[in-house]
């Protein structure tokens, strides 16, 4: 008979092996389930990793712009087209497949669009044109976009807000916001129409700014004001015609001045001057000088 008192104390790994062996004993002999246990363990780890990844994505959506968390980099752009008049040519450009594909190529994964609030006979003409443009380019099918109509965040501030998204990019679009600064504060870069108020809002919050001038407007003081701010290195400006040429020229998209400058600005490789926090005399001087010309 075996003398159990002669057994030496077992080490932890030996206890584990002994326990695993005994618990799998049956009338038919030993049944080793180590491999099965290993597969289950790996599956549990995989599920935990997937859950963690989903949590990280949700966390990143609430973080300030360009935060790096476990190699997930969030880059975001706000495009504002103005409120009272629909900037149709700008909307057509920024919703074009060429424009969106270049954003994805530059790893810009969040695009926020304020498309306008032009009302006539109780109809939001800006929203109608925005929807028509999406349908014209067939963006939902082309980019396999999911749509969420439910307002996000402070819905009392926003009108007509929707979210379009796929695995590469999120497009948050709204007609008007009474608190546009909450979007300006939380993006990496802004592309804005050349309205003086919009330019000043962006510069006061020290955001890299590209201004798009509607050169079809009569008595276009927007152009002169944008030129002066650019001369002082507070922003960069393009006419809508120039932007259209850069976006639609497929052969030179990767090397175009617009896309290079946008990429450098959003990555901090191109620095603009910050508008001094003064009593506004610089802004007043620029505006008055241009209006007097």
Curated annotation (Swiss-Prot):
Protein's UniProt keywords contain Endoplasmic reticulum: yes
Highest taxon above the source species: Eukaryota
Enzyme Commission code: 2.4.1.141
Residues annotated as transmembrane: none
Cystine connections: none
A GO BP entry: dolichol-linked oligosaccharide biosynthetic process
UniProt keyword Endoplasmic reticulum, yes or no: yes
Gene Ontology cellular-component annotations: endoplasmic reticulum
Description of how the protein assembles with itself and partners: Heterodimer with ALG14 to form a functional enzyme.
Family under the similarity heading: Belongs to the glycosyltransferase 28 family.
Entry protein name: UDP-N-acetylglucosamine transferase subunit ALG13
Gene source species: Candida albicans (strain SC5314 / ATCC MYA-2876)
Gene: ALG13
């Amino acid at each position: 008979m075996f003398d159990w008192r002669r057994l030496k104390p077992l080490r932890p790994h030996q206890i584990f092996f002994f326990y695993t062996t005994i618990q799998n004993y049956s009338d038919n002999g030993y049944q080793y389930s180590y491999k099965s246990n290993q597969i289950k363990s790996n599956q549990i780890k995989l599920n935990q990793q997937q859950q963690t990844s989903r949590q990280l994505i949700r966390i990143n959506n609430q973080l300030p712009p360009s935060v790096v968390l476990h190699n997930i980099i969030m880059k975001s752009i706000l495009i504002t087209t103005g409120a009272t008049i629909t900037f149709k040519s700008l909307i057509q450009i920024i919703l074009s497949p060429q424009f969106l594909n270049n954003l994805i190529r530059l790893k810009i994964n969040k695009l926020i669009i304020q498309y306008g609030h032009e009302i006539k006979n109780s109809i939001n003409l800006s929203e109608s044109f925005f929807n028509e443009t999406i349908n014209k380019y067939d963006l939902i099918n082309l980019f396999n976009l999911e749509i969420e109509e439910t307002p996000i965040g402070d819905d009392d501030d926003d009108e007509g807000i929707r979210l379009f998204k796929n695995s590469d990019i999120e497009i948050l679009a709204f007609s008007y916001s009474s608190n546009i600064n909450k979007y300006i504060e939380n993006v990496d870069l802004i592309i804005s129409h050349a309205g003086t108020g919009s330019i000043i809002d962006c510069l006061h919050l020290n955001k890299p700014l590209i201004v798009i001038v509607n050169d079809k407007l009569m008595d276009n003081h927007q152009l002169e004001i944008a030129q002066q701010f650019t001369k002082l290195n507070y922003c960069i400006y393009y006419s809508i015609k120039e932007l259209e040429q850069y976006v639609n020229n497929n052969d030179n998209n990767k090397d175009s001045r617009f896309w290079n400058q946008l990429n450098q600005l959003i990555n901090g490789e191109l620095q603009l001057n910050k508008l001094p926090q003064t009593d506004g005399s610089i802004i007043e001087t620029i505006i008055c000088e241009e209006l007097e010309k």
